[in-house]
């Protein structure tokens, strides 16, 4: 969710030199933003000693601004090691207190989006970030694949998996949904290698219009495929956020989490968020990230009828 903010920073503040600390894997997400220097977080940096070594690399850069968009224990320790006393520092306010009140039912109004929170972190250092200035990523030509799509094909991406069960539509519901789709549509199903990939193969069931997007594609290739979609149907997970970078309509299926927590994909209409029946599950959301979900809310997502998703899809396509 930091990508749009970094993109606007680059385009509206061209004189600022940007060094981004991230993993090699996630650096791919920024590949349409020019003139970014990367400092990679490696497995060896997970230890106390490793963080100290990483801080020495940052100190050599001698930054004027240090901006922590993660605000977790490791970044707090890392900041302690940074010796540049002349650097201005800002740390994202994740709104943890507000989110606790939200899941306790004390607050019901939508919270500030994380995109906005990241932008405000820069603005605390008088670096203006207007998210309306974000330019969507350009469509990427699909190469190195075994699928042939015509320009008339409707491409629908489905990302049916999530890290936690309470955020994941059941396999039976996904099967029923896919079987209800127009047979002329090309259905591209995304998932991680291993168990998820095996489930995708089952979902595809040797149908010519169903395609496995998993270990056969790296992240850069998957982004190229996503950029060509007409719509993405996603759980509360990363694929929806990636699709939103390309200006693609994203239908998000929510379970124990909720879009009011501020983690929805960029620039999507409220109607694109499909949530369980709040009359049956009045305490939603009961978790922010999907962990520590009450047992009686784990299956809330599976009370969402396929017809509701199809109705929204029909209005988009």
Question: Whereabouts are the PLM-identified features?
Answer:
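Catalytic machinery of carbohydrate-active enzymes
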Residues: 1-317
